[in-house]
Amino acid sequence: MTGTALTGMMIVAAGLFAAGVFGVLARRGILFQLISLEVALSGPALAFIAAGAYHGDAEGQGMFVLVLTLAAAEVAVGLALFLRIRRSKGSDDSDAVSGLKG
């Protein structure tokens, strides 16, 4: 892999991360926030793969497996919380959930 290809892959990875973070901050629905979080996690995963391919070692692939495992755990916990919130509040709006009791 050349330096130009690595630069292009890093730009795409940064774009994915930025789009995911924007989606988490801009959307109100919890399900859309979970999807945006997955997009945000795919950015660093792509960066690990590209850097590993550029340097010719397998550490990037190992980090990708770690990010993939983290994303799978995040989806499992996030969907369980989403279903619980949807049943108790009747809405998937994150503003409805964030009300403090006191």
Swiss-Prot record:
Membrane protein topology class: Multi-pass membrane protein
GO biological process, any: ATP synthesis coupled electron transport
Keywords for this protein: Cell inner membrane, Cell membrane, Membrane, NAD, Quinone, Translocase, Transmembrane, Transmembrane helix, Transport, Ubiquinone
InterPro entries to which the protein is assigned, alphabetical: NADH_UbQ_OxRdtase_chain4L/K, NUOK/Mnh_C1-like
EC numbers, comma separated: 7.1.1.-
One Pfam family of this chain: Oxidored_q2
Enzyme category, top tier: translocase
Keyword flag Lipid metabolism: no
Gene3D superfamilies: 1.10.287.3510
Annotated localization: Cell inner membrane
Bilayer-crossing regions: 5-25, 30-50, 63-83
GO molecular function: NADH:ubiquinone reductase (non-electrogenic) activity; quinone binding
Catalysed reaction, written as an equation: a quinone + NADH + 5 H(+)(in) = a quinol + NAD(+) + 4 H(+)(out)
Domain of life: Bacteria
GO CC annotations, alphabetized: NADH dehydrogenase complex; plasma membrane
PANTHER family documented for this protein: NADH-UBIQUINONE OXIDOREDUCTASE CHAIN 4L, NADH-UBIQUINONE OXIDOREDUCTASE SUBUNIT ND4L
Role according to the record: NDH-1 shuttles electrons from NADH, via FMN and iron-sulfur (Fe-S) centers, to quinones in the respiratory chain. The immediate electron acceptor for the enzyme in this species is believed to be ubiquinone. Couples the redox reaction to proton translocation (for every two electrons transferred, four hydrogen ions are translocated across the cytoplasmic membrane), and thus conserves the redox energy in a proton gradient.
Classification via HAMAP family: NDH1_NuoK
Entry similarity comment: Belongs to the complex I subunit 4L family.
Protein name per its UniProtKB record: NADH-quinone oxidoreductase subunit K
Taxonomic classification: Bacteria, Pseudomonadati, Pseudomonadota, Alphaproteobacteria, Hyphomicrobiales
